[in-house]
């Protein structure tokens, strides 16, 4: 009887040790490796981002391109042309073009075209007329100076204009910006209230304005000189801008 009890206790001890070992295992409560791998692939944000962003990258130009219009009237971003420089400057030359993916256009007869011929003048983008591109403005340069100063502007060709080379280019332009000062207002203030320095204060030249104010316009001499200088445009705004 005692041996039977000892055998039962031994079996219970072995069973309890097995249960404790299983419960303390690091794999309890976790998915099998293949299930965990499948979950990580299905819920990966990288995979979803790539698949959802790819059509946006390829179709971002489609909204700018009219559908069903003439192929020859499409903007430059909507077509792909086999451009080359083997042409005479200023003369028209024919180039073979095709609409980009997702863009549909027709010929003059209303038939859909995959390839068409586009006639362009042989000239680079930086050789276009100033009305055919837009350039950045600069308010950091003096417009009233001798010789006239220039600044480096970034220019971009208009959408409907076709040309050779890069559509974004750098160009040296004259400083030509205004701060809102009117020449007529400055001249009127110089004639009427120039003795109190009102013209100089209006142009932002407060030091000269204080000098005229406390000297009563230089006893009239400074006032007459300022009328002449403002009248011919020699004296301008203190920020270096042009008159309106």
Curated annotation (Swiss-Prot):
Membrane topology recorded in Swiss-Prot or TrEMBL: Multi-pass membrane protein
Transmembrane segments: 177-197, 213-233
InterPro entries: TM2 (IPR007829), TM2D1-3-like (IPR050932)
Ranges facing Cytoplasmic side: 198-212
Domain of life from the UniProt record: Eukaryota
Entry-listed glycosylation sites: 86, 94, 115, 137, 152, 176
Pfam families membership: TM2 (PF05154)
GO CC, alphabetical: membrane
Record carries keyword Transmembrane: yes
Keywords carried by this UniProt record: Glycoprotein, Membrane, Signal, Transmembrane, Transmembrane helix
Extracellular membrane side: 22-176, 234-244
Main location: membrane
Domain TM2: 180-227
Localization of this protein: Membrane
Signal peptide: 1-21
Keyword set includes Membrane: yes
PANTHER family attached to this UniProt entry: BETA-AMYLOID BINDING PROTEIN-RELATED (PTHR21016), TM2 DOMAIN-CONTAINING PROTEIN 3 (PTHR21016:SF7)
Family indicated by similarity: Belongs to the TM2 family.
Protein's name according to its UniProt entry: TM2 domain-containing protein 3
Annotated gene: tm2d3
């Amino acid at each position: 009887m005692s041996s039977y009890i000892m055998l039962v206790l031994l079996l219970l001890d072995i069973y309890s040790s097995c249960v404790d070992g299983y419960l303390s295992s690091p794999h309890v409560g976790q998915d099998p490796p293949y299930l965990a791998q499948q979950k990580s692939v299905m819920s990966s944000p990288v995979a979803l981002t790539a698949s959802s962003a790819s059509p946006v990258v390829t179709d971002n130009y489609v909204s700018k391109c009219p559908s069903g219009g003439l192929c020859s009237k499409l903007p430059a971003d909507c077509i792909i042309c086999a451009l080359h420089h083997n042409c005479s400057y200023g003369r028209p030359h024919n180039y073979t073009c095709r609409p980009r993916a997702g863009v549909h256009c027709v010929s003059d007869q209303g038939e859909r075209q995959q390839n068409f011929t586009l006639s362009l003048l042989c000239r680079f983008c930086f050789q276009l007329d100033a009305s055919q591109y837009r350039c950045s403005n600069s308010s950091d340069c003096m417009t009233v100076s001798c010789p006239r100063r220039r600044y480096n502007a970034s220019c971009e060709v208009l959408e409907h204009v076709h040309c050779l080379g890069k559509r974004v280019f750098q160009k040296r332009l004259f400083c030509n910006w205004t701060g809102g000062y009117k020449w007529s207002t400055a001249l009127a203030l110089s004639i009427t209230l120039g003795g109190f320095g009102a013209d100089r204060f209006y142009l932002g030249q407060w030091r000269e304005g204080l000098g005229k104010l406390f000297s009563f316009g230089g006893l009239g001499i400074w006032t007459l000189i300022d009328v002449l200088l403002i009248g011919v445009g020699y004296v301008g705004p203190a920020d270096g801008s042009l008159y309106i």
